[in-house]
């Protein structure tokens, strides 16, 4: 619950998230519901970290993960990773995941956007066939384990984050997570 006026936004906002594992189709479904009593801004996402290779010791990076994103455009960031408000073409840049590429293939390129984000930390403007429809936004595959993740969303954008600022924190089973040891796909408005 977010009270009317909290963080400067109008309305009492109630948010409900449901996480559901579907064993029949081997899927994790995340559903969001929000209600408010005044017109306000709501832009919910999730920041789940994934490493499809598993948590071997040491934790492998996601550099070998193969990513595709159904987007012709992305939103550039400034030197402190804040979106500039521009929308730029991915074509001809290391931001282009319209065809499969490994994360590590171009992540250390001297392309200004990758330097600003210390890797990928950008919102991609999805090629939607219909506003609000549930569509495939991205895929991610680990070639060693064979694990494949498909990301579907009703939102207009998806943020790709490659764990650039992970600093070796300890997770489950004593695994540590250094930079680039996880990947996020954050469905969102932009």
Which residue stretches match the model-derived regions?
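An exposed, glycine/acidic-rich loop-and-rim segment of catalytic or binding clefts
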Residues: 1-190
């Amino acid at each position: 619950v977010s009270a009317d006026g909290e963080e400067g936004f109008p309305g009492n906002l109630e948010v409900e998230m449901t996480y559901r594992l579907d064993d029949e189709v081997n899927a994790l479904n995340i559903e969001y519901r929000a209600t408010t009593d005044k017109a306000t801004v709501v832009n919910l996402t999730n920041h789940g970290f994934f490493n499809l290779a598993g948590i071997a010791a040491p934790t492998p990076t996601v550099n070998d993960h193969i990513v595709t994103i159904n987007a012709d455009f992305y939103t550039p960031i400034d030197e402190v990773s804040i979106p500039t408000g521009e929308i730029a073409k991915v074509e001809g840049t290391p931001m282009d995941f319209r065809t499969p590429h490994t994360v590590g293939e171009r992540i250390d390129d001297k392309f200004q956007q990758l330097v600003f984000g210390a890797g990928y930390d950008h919102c991609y403007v999805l090629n939607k066939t219909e506003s609000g429809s549930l569509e495939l936004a991205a895929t991610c595959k680990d070639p060693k384990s064979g694990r494949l993740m498909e990301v579907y969303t009703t939102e207009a954008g998806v943020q790709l984050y490659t764990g650039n600022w992970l600093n070796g924190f300890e997770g489950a089973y004593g695994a540590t997570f250094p930079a680039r040891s996880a990947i996020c796909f954050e469905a969102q408005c932009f």
